[in-house]
Amino acid sequence: MKTFAQLRLLLAAAALALLSFSAQAQLSIEITGAGASRFPVIIPVFENEASLPRSVSDIVRADLERSGLFSLVDIGPLPLPEGQIPDLGSLRSRGADAALAASVFPQGDGRYEIRFRLFDTQKQTELGALALRMTAAQNRITAHRIADFVYEKLTGLPGYFATRIAYVVKTGPRYELQVADADGMNAQAALVSREPIISPAWSPDGGRLAYVSFEAKKPIIYVHTLATGQRQVVANFKGSNSAPAWSPDGQQLSVVLTKDGLSQLYVLNADGSGVRRLASSSGIDTEPAWSPDGQWIYFTSDRGGSPQIYRIPTAGGAAQRVTFDGTYNVTARPSADGRLLAFITRNNGRFQVAVQDLTTRQTTILTDSARDESPSFAPNGRMILYATDAGGRGVLAAVSSDGRVKQRLSVQAADVREPAWGPLQKQ
């Protein structure tokens, strides 16, 4: 767990001991806690699914089960064809509250169309239908979108399966910035270095990552276009350049610079131009994060004597303190709907993930671990990804915003840190 004193060392450009990942390995996910009541649903084998090179329904089932909100009702190897209304009463008698009927149609051009309908077995009604076209290589993203469809229809919240996560992993002297699907699969290295990589941050469109690299023997902020691999230096000033955070429109970054002395907040354009200082204080200001409406920037500061979370208008003005419970609260990250603020709090000497309801100001500690850091919300605000320690090495973990659903993501023989949850992938 990074203490605020250690952040001082970072901002003075001291090397951080980070954790990362191996190029070929995949994250494995273990569900360590589930919702109090799970929704029983049938996701059968799709009709004509054998025509696909790889299964799609298996991935849909895995997504929904991993969420901790659903229990899968097995009806055996028989499909429920999309073109027929199933015997909903019979499916209800098997204990299912909902059922997916789906069929695969080869298109003759190397593509496939998957048509599916979701039914409420209790009300005997159809909840919705959709058709998705895919190539053989798109089986995973298509499955994630089907799972998102089911998730949204049954919970009322957008799904988060068709998203990607970024994280830094370390194997021996090798650091890698990895990007993977939210289920840990399809991991690819965006950057490999023998020097630390920290603070990855997704652009709102999911096409770019901003991060800090020490490859030039000092912390420099880069913006990396994932589709092309092209990188651009956006902050390489005297001293430390750290903690990039994107504005909601993707046009600007808030960063922390020490070019004028102490670490202070600045805003600049995404190409590195138009640098302006946002705030001045006699303490350390760091870890900025934009509010979803773009009107505020949350940040960590010790200006009041202990590390606490503040916010400041993006147009400039007086800072307002946000956290008052405890003597150590850092790394604020707002949910996409602006309702919750996730952060790290120190509780009886343990560093844990907490959330504050920004309307009621009530704070809830979500985890029972001791060395949590780097919280990052899923796009729907339901889950929070974070880094922690397990068995003497770094792992990623996720917890629902109510604390009930818990997951652990790890890689064999590697350390993983610095997670960032990306936006929904475009069609």
From Swiss-Prot:
Record has Membrane as a keyword: no
Species, as recorded: Azoarcus sp. (strain BH72)
Gene3D superfamilies: TolB, C-terminal domain, TolB, N-terminal domain
PANTHER family: PROTEIN TOLB, PROTEIN TOLB HOMOLOG
NCBIfam families for this protein: propeller_TolB (TIGR02800)
Family: Belongs to the TolB family.
Protein name: Tol-Pal system protein TolB
Signal peptide extent: 1-25
